[in-house]
Design a protein with these regions (language model features):
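Long, well-ordered, tryptophan-enriched scaffold segments
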Residues: 1-165
């Protein structure tokens, strides 16, 4: 499988380095880390998010598996609960395939942000703040791990500060 990327102009690119190039029968030289279009061999600047460059916002269903298992395995009854559905908006764009079929697409980053509960002004069941016990917030992790939400926030900010100062190194 090979993932498609888009640039700021909306042009689609098949980047070299996509995992599908790893198992080609005949080596094409496209299993590498160069950010180039595998078809045209031209470099491009990929768009990280469709937010602000989208055709529409769409609801995506995510599953919250928090209560589907027991964290105390010695007392587990072996019975589980169903996952809870969480609906969150993501920015999307419509593209046409070569056979004229229309597809609705988004970026992996936009899906990741929605899964993690980072609203970016989008609609849906996003956490209101760090104290909201929805999945992946400091309040949620405190209930799951016993680690204080304030400590989790502090550590997260220190990681971010270090990344900024070292430019990600």
């Amino acid at each position: 499988w090979k993932l498609i990327m888009t640039d700021g102009e909306g042009k689609l690119h098949l980047p070299t380095g996509s995992v599908g190039f790893r198992w080609e029968e005949e080596p094409t030289g496209n299993w590498n880390l160069q950010l180039k279009n595998a078809v045209t061999k031209e470099g491009f600047d990929p768009l990280l998010t469709l937010l602000g460059n989208d055709d529409q916002k769409v609801m995506v269903s995510f599953s919250d598996f928090t209560d589907t298992f027991s964290i105390d395995m010695s007392k587990s009854t072996g019975e589980s609960q169903s996952a809870v559905e969480i609906l969150r908006e993501v920015p999307a764009r419509r593209i046409k395939t070569t056979d004229g079929k229309e597809l609705l697409v988004t970026t992996a980053f936009d899906l990741l942000m929605a899964q993690a509960g980072v609203s970016r002004g989008l609609g849906g069941d996003y956490p209101v703040d760090y104290d909201d016990p929805k999945p992946y917030t400091p309040a949620w992790q405190e209930a799951q791990t016993g680690v204080s939400r304030d400590l989790a926030i502090q550590v997260g900010r220190e990681f971010a500060d270090n990344a900024e100062k070292t430019k990600g190194k």
